[in-house]
Amino acid sequence: FIPVIYWLIHSESRPLFWDEYSHWGIYIREMVSTHQLWTIETNAAHPDYPPGNALWQYFFTLIPGYNEGIVYLAQFVLLITPLLVLFENICRKQLLWIPAIMALLALGLSNFGHGIVSLYADHIIGVWYAGILLQGLQSHPGHPKIMGLLSMPLAVLLLIKDAGIPLVASAVAFLFLLLVY
């Protein structure tokens, strides 16, 4: 439901910030036009970034074709996905918490970095890291299989940007401490 509202509001959005023009936007455009990952010959300012965001955006643009609104929608879905953990344990008696949590998320995300209409990766890394830690706290540490499922979002963190490496290391250490203690 929320992505539909986002699409209705931001379907005509265009790049605004420097990094969207210098590399984040170029990555997805090159992937859509060549149907492969970018190489060292890319026009982007930083050809060595991992392909996580652009790969996700590419999958969104496969069927309808390239549209910057679709790219922003893909980025928004990537941004809110780890936040779904906040709604996981809400029961019927707590339904009034949903608007309150959504308001806090809207306030936090709109003031976090460049907001929700941005191709930047830094706020995506922060939200995924927070989502992984929250899911680790919410999971049952006595069940290593459940904790092991967090390896998938940890891999996403590595695919987004190189800054994910120390975050993954600290999250693994945190999850290990949860298992031990």
Explain the meaning of each model-derived region.
Residues Q57-Y58, A106-S110, G131-L133, L149-L154, ...:
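Hydrophobic, membrane-inserted alpha-helices
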Residues V4-W7, L104-S110, A155-L159:
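Aromatic-anchored segments of alpha-helical transmembrane domains
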Residues F87-P99, H143-P144, Y181:
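Membrane-interface helix-loop-helix junctions at transmembrane boundaries of multi-pass membrane enzymes
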Residues I146-A173:
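Membrane-interface alpha helices of multi-pass inner-membrane proteins
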Residues C91-K93, Y129-I146:
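Membrane-interface transmembrane helices that cradle and orient dolichyl/undecaprenyl
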Residues Y6-L95, S118:
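Active-site lumenal/periplasmic loops and adjacent helix-entry segments of GT-C-fold
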Residues L73-L78, A100-L105, N111-G136:
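Multi-pass, polyprenyl lipid-linked donor-dependent membrane glycosyltransferases
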